[in-house]
Amino acid sequence: YMNTQILYYPALDFSDHSYDVWDVDAYGKDLHPMVAGKVRALAQKNFGTLCQAYLGDPALMNDELASPLLCADYQKFPQTIMMTAEFDFLRQQCEEFVQKLDKAGVKVDYTMFAGTFHGFLERIGFFDQADDSIHLMVGKWFEFLEEA
């Protein structure tokens, strides 16, 4: 039994329609065109590659175990700590998942790190956001453990 999940910018919807529903304008109206283009390209053009790398079998794309955003009952999820990045092409999936967990009554703590992108955690010691996220995540995890 798992009572807490800690998620850093996860892919939460591999379904074949998912890249059509994410709006690049959600990243801000003042988003530099180059950044907007990269976000759009990652969300659309590379999605098939992402599915292949994570799932192997395209038949699993619509399985709720692979695509938790398709889940019918969010109450079965454990309390969740979610970290994502401002310019992450998966950010909107993360935010939708957080909303669904919250609506289902699941305790959830969400932090979006401004000014960074998918994979920022790999830059511990170089990006303040990576260092800050580790400290925040550990603190939140201990809070969750104390309340459990």
Question: Language-model features: where?
Answer:
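Alpha/beta-hydrolase superfamily serine-hydrolase fold, recognizing
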Residues: 1-148
